[in-house]
Amino acid sequence: MALLISLPGETPAMAQILLLLSSACLHAGNSARSNGGNDFGVNQPERCSGVQGGSIDIPFSFYFPWKLAKDPQMSIAWRWKDFFGHFIYNSSMPFIHEHFKGRLILNWTQGQTSGVLRILNFKESDQTWYFCRVFLQTTEGIKFWQSLPGTQLTLTQALNTTMRSPFIVTSEFTTAGLEHTRDKRNPSLMNLGAMVTMLLAKVVVIILVYGWMIFLRWKQRPDPA
């Protein structure tokens, strides 16, 4: 759904004012009713989501039945937060809102009826509604319309396993490996020491037993006298 302003010979500023007034009336009393005969409009997805710090795209397209003027002066603008919200981008100036400085890219050229608005370094404060506005000159005068529903952007939380630093994961596995190696190494050394001690004890016992047996035999030997 889109709201159209048609002003033969009028200025874009006047078109902007009438657009706001007409939209206010539409929202106040007739927002639920649609005109099946409309052959113009702006298409935007109902909602898009992205990861914090990444980029997010809002695709758009528009259509109209009129014949373009020799110099159509076609331009694209974007608002945010609500239908009457502040402009964040205007291709005809060009203009970029302070909040989005260095973070907006409009992939669209004159004559095209579709494009993509890309927001870089997506932030939590970017979560709101975005509305595409189209302005052009036709043989019937100025035509100026804007998407009514807009597109809602939301932040998607990434899974913890993907958000954790590889260095931290590697460190944990390395630490666990060292502890595991240490736990395996110390018992081995202790077992080896115990085995040596037991072996020495057995040798001492054997020597004592054999020595005692030799002593007894020597004691029991008949006296040669």
Swiss-Prot record:
Locations listed in the record:
Membrane
Keyword set includes Transmembrane helix:
yes
- Side of membrane Cytoplasmic, spans: 217-225
| Ranges that cross the membrane | 196-216
Topology relative to the membrane, per the entry? Single-pass type I membrane protein
**Coiled-coil residue windows:** none
Name of the protein in its database record: Paired immunoglobulin-like type 2 receptor beta-2
Q: Which organism is it from?
A: Mus musculus
**GN (gene name):** Pilrb2
